[in-house]
């Protein structure tokens, strides 16, 4: 009875409240609408523009790899055969150096000579070179040794000092600078000469010889890659960097042809073109590669006036590869070209396998690049997966998803980037050594090579969980490496300390 009276009273009260439009009070949380400030919106707009730019550049390179690096390379039939001088600088013993040097002797090209340049007559690498010359008596090959007591010294760059004698002594105008620690396919020289003479970049013409429109290729280079031949952290990270982030942007920038982007592992150009570029530097209109005046113009005029000595001018720079490409590009109005080939370096030396070695190598070259291409180096960390994804997620979340950071989108970004890198890694790994020319492929360049044990017999894919581990580690380390590089100017190269000056030259300490 009491319960019935209570229910009746509640019903009467509800009807009365409804009659007077009185709603019962219910406590609700006070949720403020998402309203970012004008400054944050502007920042998000800038971030999304940059995010889109990075994605466009990255996938521009990725699709070029899918198109031009995903199949067996063919051997062109050149309309005319020009002689080529192959210069291979030696400094000590590198991992699998004999196999790397042998790749020059195996080139499927009818007319070339090999000059092996050695800094000192006591260098231990001389024995390896001499054995190869005996093994290939039909190949025009010789060793040029420096004077151990009075070595060539045109500047602090030991590689240029070593190469200078071979550059001057070469029989042919076309020079192929090929480091002693890289291996190339047997058809690489033929494709490179064809690209130089017909002005091709990955098979596409860049210059109309009838109308004169476009830029003529005057430097041919090959994508640098590295294979870890032992299961060590440092070499695995190098392999991951070169097969993913570096190759993607390296190929993309080269295709866009807005500025030179060249690694010096494997470069082919005409000696007469480089001598001409140095001569023009010395005339004073553009006295140096960074626009400064003074002794650089004087030195350029001196070396440019003597045929076969233009290379010596670049001994003042640690990054001579980029500076040579810059001179050929801006002084001679040329551009660079790729051929679909790779310069493959086996990594596994005693002093190069640790995580510390990897960190020091990356810091060293970032410090060099900081002085050569400052703007690009400052922006570099924003092109890496994690930081780029952070900017992109903030921008898209702020502008479209009513939040400051949507973790679901960030994870989606990471997964797409990782799958892209995984696909690209294995496309390059599978096809880097594939050539229709007769090619003696060394074990480390075989697609199924496994540094962790027996070869991958049924698949050339790296073990996924191990691949992901090194991929994540490399991505996480990218920003700390960049910060460390930006905070210093001193570098250690070939066990020698250097400082990079504001005019881009190097000073040995």
UniProtKB/Swiss-Prot annotation:
User: Pathway listed for it?
Assistant: Lipid metabolism; sphingolipid metabolism
> Could you tell me the superkingdom of the organism this chain comes from?
Eukaryota
Q: Which InterPro entries match?
A: Ceramide_glucosylTrfase, Nucleotide-diphossugar_trans
GO CC terms, sorted:
Golgi membrane
State which Enzyme Commission number(s) the record gives. Answer: 2.4.1.80
A GO molecular-function term, please?
ceramide glucosyltransferase activity
Q: Where is this motif: D1?
A: 123
Q: Where is this motif: D3?
A: 321
Sequence motif D2, residues: 179
The stretches that face the Cytoplasmic side, renumbered to this chain, are 64-384, 430-466
The record, for Gene3D superfamilies, names: Spore Coat Polysaccharide Biosynthesis Protein SpsA, Chain A (3.90.550.10)
Topological domain, Lumenal: which ranges?
1-42, 406-408, 488-509
| Its job | Catalyzes the final step in the biosynthesis of the membrane lipid glucosylceramide (GluCer), the transfer of glucose to ceramide. Glucosylceramides play important roles in growth, differentiation and pathogenicity.
Family indicated by similarity: Belongs to the glycosyltransferase 2 family.
* Protein name as catalogued: Ceramide glucosyltransferase
């Amino acid at each position: 009875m009491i319960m019935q009276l209570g229910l009746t009273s509640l019903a009467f009260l509800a009807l009365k409240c409804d009659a007077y439009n009185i709603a019962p009070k219910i406590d609700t949380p006070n949720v403020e609408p998402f309203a970012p400030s004008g400054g944050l919106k502007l920042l998000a707009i800038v971030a999304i523009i940059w995010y889109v730019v990075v994605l466009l550049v990255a996938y521009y390179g990725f699709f070029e790899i899918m198109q031009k690096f995903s199949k067996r390379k063919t051997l062109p039939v050149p309309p005319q055969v020009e002689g080529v001088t192959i210069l291979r600088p030696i400094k000590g013993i590198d991992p699998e150096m004999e196999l790397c040097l042998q790749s020059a002797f195996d080139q499927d090209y009818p007319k070339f000579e090999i000059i092996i340049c050695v800094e000192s007559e006591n260098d231990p690498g001389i024995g390896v070179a001499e054995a190869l010359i005996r093994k290939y008596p039909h190949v025009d090959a010789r060793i040029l040794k420096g004077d151990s007591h009075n070595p060539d010294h045109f500047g602090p760059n030991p590689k240029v000092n070593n190469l200078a004698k071979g550059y001057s002594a070469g029989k042919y105008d076309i020079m192929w600078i090929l480091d002693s620690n890289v291996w190339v396919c047997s058809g690489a020289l033929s494709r490179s000469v064809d690209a130089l003479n017909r002005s091709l970049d990955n098979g596409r013409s860049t210059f109309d010889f009838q109308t004169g429109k476009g830029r003529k290729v005057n430097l041919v280079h090959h994508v640098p890659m590295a294979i870890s031949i032992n299961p060590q952290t440092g070499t695995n990270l190098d392999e991951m960097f070169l097969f993913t982030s570096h190759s993607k942007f390296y190929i993309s920038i080269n295709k866009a042809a807005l500025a030179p982007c060249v690694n010096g592992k494997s470069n082919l150009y005409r000696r007469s073109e480089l001598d001409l570029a140095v001569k023009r530097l010395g005339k004073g209109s553009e006295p140096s590669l960074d626009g400064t005046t003074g002794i650089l113009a004087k030195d350029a005029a001196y070396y440019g006036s003597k045929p076969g000595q233009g290379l010596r001018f670049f001994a003042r720079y640690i990054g001579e590869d980029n500076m040579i490409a810059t001179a050929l590009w801006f002084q001679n109005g040329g551009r660079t070209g790729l051929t679909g080939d790779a310069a493959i370096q086996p990594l596994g030396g005693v002093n190069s396998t640790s995580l510390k070695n990897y960190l020091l190598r990356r810091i060293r070259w970032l410090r060099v690049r900081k002085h050569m291409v400052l703007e690009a180096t400052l922006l570099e960390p924003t092109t890496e997966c994690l930081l780029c994804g952070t900017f992109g997620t903030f921008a898209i979340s702020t502008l479209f998803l009513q939040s400051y950071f949507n973790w679901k989108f960030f994870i989606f970004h990471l997964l797409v980037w990782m799958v892209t890198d995984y696909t690209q890694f294995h496309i390059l790994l599978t096809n880097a050594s594939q050539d229709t020319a007769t090619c003696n492929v060394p074990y480390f360049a075989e697609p199924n090579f496994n540094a962790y044990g027996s070869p991958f017999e049924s698949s050339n894919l790296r073990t996924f969980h191990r691949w992901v581990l090194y991929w994540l580690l490399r991505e996480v380390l990218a920003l700390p490496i960049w910060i460390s590089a930006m905070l210093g100017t001193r570098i250690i190269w070939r066990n020698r300390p250097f400082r990079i000056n504001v005019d881009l030259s190097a000073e040995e300490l």
